[in-house]
Amino acid sequence: MYRMFTREEALALWSRLVAGWAHSLDESGARTLMDGAPNYADAGGSYEGVTRMLWGLGGWLSQPGRSAVVRWRGESFDTAALLRRALVAGTDPQSPGYWGSAPARGAYDQRTVESGQVAFATWQTRERIWNAMSDGERANLVAWLDRFGQWPPQWRNNWALFWALNHASRKALGAPYDQELIDSVLEYLDGVYCGDGWYDDGPRRGVRHFDDYNAWVFATHVLSWAQCDGDSRPDRRDELLDRVRQYMRHVPYFFAANGAYAEYGRSLSYKFARLGAPLWAYKLQAWPHSTGMLRRLVGRHLRWYVDRGAVRADGTLSQALTAEGSLEIREPYIATGSTYWAMLAFGALWSLPDDDPFWTAEEEPLPAEQGDFIRVFPQPGWVVVGTQATGAVQRFNAGSQHYPAKYGKFVYATAAPFNVGLADGRPSPDAMLCLTDGQDLGHRSETLASVVGEPGWLRMRYQQKVGGGVHTVDTTIATRGEVHLRAHRVTLDATAQGPVAVVEGAAPLGYVSGDHPAIDGDALAGWEMASAGGQAVAIARLAGYDGQRRAAAWKGRDDLNSVFGHYVLPALTVDRLQPVHELVCLVHIGGSGVDPSTLAGQVADASWQEDGSFRLTWSDGSSVDVPPLPEEQAER
């Protein structure tokens, strides 16, 4: 019997998280001492473990009349006292828990990131915390915010929003602030806005950095600014909220029926932080879907992480996505407390009144439950495919770029989460075409040109450096439910030394400890397959390949997956590429009911045309025509 997401369930999880966090605090109450992989920001305890918990505490204490006391397993935790203690100790230069001195003027410093939510949480809780502070405590807090709110040389990415929220919240508190800085950041947003709700995370449009920062910085910080300072510029507020509303139209399509997210990009250690934007959008009437759909999305997404061990036994958040997933999901900047950016979800959730209709609305199905869909997003260069039969979602990426394992795969699928760990310093070839000289393994680097289009195709040109040469690859992908076709035209650099080979992985089939995947293949028919837990991945060669690899852990490393503790990867190979070599294969990611021997028969013809276009004809007679790529990538 299906269990709807309730306020009681949310409160129980919140109480567990508060208890785990409170038990991790140092003696000052301004830093956390947690297990994990520490970095430089953990020296003396993680300040981020406290500053980021302020998202949740600020939301919880923002509602008048709500008790500050949270109870978990017989213990009581006074969240107002914990918040005040953190703010006082963290901003007192004489405290051992002090959050740090000022950087060089204008430098980008991690504490500038934290200053936004420190200021915003103080504004949210002004009646309980700010007004109860002594003059000296308020002076220390404002001085700390000012130290980390000085003008930088330029606005270079989403960090601009941290400066803006710092100053806007101080303005709302009646403290000193810089209106020119706030206005400058709001103007910066126009320079990186690409339309349809999407922001390019760079100093200007055209760098093609699209990922979850659209949710957990651009959208959330615009929504935060709208709450504390939006009334001062109502026209600008409404314009920015309309952009959020456009972005929110897309959001539900990235979630599977079971609440899984098509994980992709950096900072995935922040986990369910992505729920903050839709919840605040709902609060500010910028959520364009039903309240019931939002309730289902929030509940299922939180459960997905909890059910997979993202919250440890002691009630603290892990840096990995799940209990078994690779810790290599974390970037070097992710300290032990950095994961508490996830508290954005609870900050937005608890900003809703206890009697909000959100808690009583009848849950409504997510798009992946309603029917099959293909959504094309030209701005980030994505195609998102949902399959009702399995409830799974696949995100195909042609245009966005950054770290190779987290951005360079062809597809990021809820049914087959990507391998994030590196083997011998190189990404696993799952959902990648990798050139190799026998020593080095290439991967998709900078995308030279890309385009996506209806009814769900992608085309991209990129380079790989292998064997002393820079080789060019033109890849076309056409999607059709759980199956997609990949076609590559590889042009080798004539100056390269020695032969160049290929390995191309399907997608990794992840499985939990104790499970045993079924593995099969047919070298003559040209397919390989693996299945476990009701899921399957398969790859079949149509043209250009001369070998294949039975599904196994890449280089014997079965600890590379972002979600699962184990995986296997079926792959195709080419022993030696010709100067211009064309490759075509078909990949299945989804339910285990697939018959791999029938995959190749789904395609009647797939070929490049004289004008540079690519034509695919499926066996049912339907066809897809993909136009040639431009020689240079136009600004988006």
Region annotations inferred by a language model:
Residues 69-72:
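Long, charge-dense tracts
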